[in-house]
């Protein structure tokens, strides 16, 4: 298992569950979020007995990423695992979608994956070891109307995952993606019970996923058990894409 992990979008939901799962398996963790999340970091450190740090970062900004990741790598004394989880949605029909809604989703969901990966790469290459796990989405594989920006961003994350796996493999760095389906997060909690039931009825396992389901898949890909797995997209969707 990695011992020095960085997780973006870690203040809540899937990102927080990933940070907790990595900590539970013995990794020190840096939690990256737009405003920092000291309460969550402190709670993880207390529960699992690992070192945690948190830094505020706009993951769509090159300068912000460079600054935050330098602090993160210095605090950890290196980095052997990066989880690119930060993301937003701004759904809307193309005819009505504002330029900024398209641009902001691409910047936060796709550009950030490039920026954060680049920020850890020199350290991982020097160590000839690294685990990079990108959080994509079922919507990057099998999408729906009204998500042109989000679907494009997540499909891009999948393409970047595959390209980077080929580029970094000779340096001992694996790059994989996890593609969650309908996960029970703050976003889905805001849906009506009728809508949630409608989504659940489409899923072979007959329930929405939990953030912990995604976190366990990430932890597997970060572990030595997955040392010969790279360039892959693991669906965590209850069979929705079967």
Regions found by a protein language model. Give the residues of each.
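Conserved glycine-rich cofactor-binding loop
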Residues: 11-13
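Conserved glycine-rich Rossmann-like NAD(P)H-binding loop of the short-chain dehydrogenase/reductase
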Residues: 25-41
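Substrate-binding pocket helix/loop in short-chain dehydrogenase/reductase
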Residues: 93-94, 98-106, 199
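Active-site helix of classical SDR
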Residues: 117, 153, 161
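Alpha-helical segment proximal to the catalytic Tyr-Lys
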Residues: 122, 166-167, 227
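Residue(s) in the substrate-gating loop at a strand-loop-helix junction
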Residues: 137
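Short, small/polar-rich loop/turn modules that mediate ligand/substrate recognition or access, typified
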Residues: 169, 174, 229-231
């Amino acid at each position: 298992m990695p011992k020095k992990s960085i997780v973006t979008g870690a203040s809540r939901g899937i990102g927080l569950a990933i940070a907790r799962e990595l900590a539970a398996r013995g990794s020190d963790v840096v939690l990256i979020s737009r405003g920092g999340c000291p309460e969550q970091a402190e709670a993880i450190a207390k529960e699992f007995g690992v070192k945690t740090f948190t830094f505020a970062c706009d993951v769509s900004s090159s300068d912000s990423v460079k600054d935050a990741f330098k602090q993160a790598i210095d605090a950890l004394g290196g980095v052997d695992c990066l989880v690119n989880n930060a993301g937003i949605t701004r759904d809307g029909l193309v005819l009505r979608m504002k330029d900024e809604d398209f641009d902001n989703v691409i910047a936060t969901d796709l550009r950030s994956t490039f920026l954060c990966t680049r920020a850890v790469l020199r350290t991982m290459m020097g160590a000839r070891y690294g685990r990079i796990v990108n959080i994509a989405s079922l919507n990057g594989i099998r999408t729906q109307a009204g998500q042109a920006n989000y679907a494009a961003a997540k499909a891009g994350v999948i393409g970047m995952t595959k390209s980077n796996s080929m580029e970094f493999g000779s340096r001992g760095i694996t790059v994989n993606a996890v593609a969650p389906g309908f996960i029970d997060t703050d976003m889905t909690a805001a849906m009506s019970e009728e809508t949630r039931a409608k989504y659940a009825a489409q899923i072979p396992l007959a329930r929405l996923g939990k953030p912990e389901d995604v976190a366990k898949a990430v932890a597997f890909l970060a572990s030595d058990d997955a040392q010969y797995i790279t360039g892959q997209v693991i669906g965590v969707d209850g069979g929705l894409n079967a």
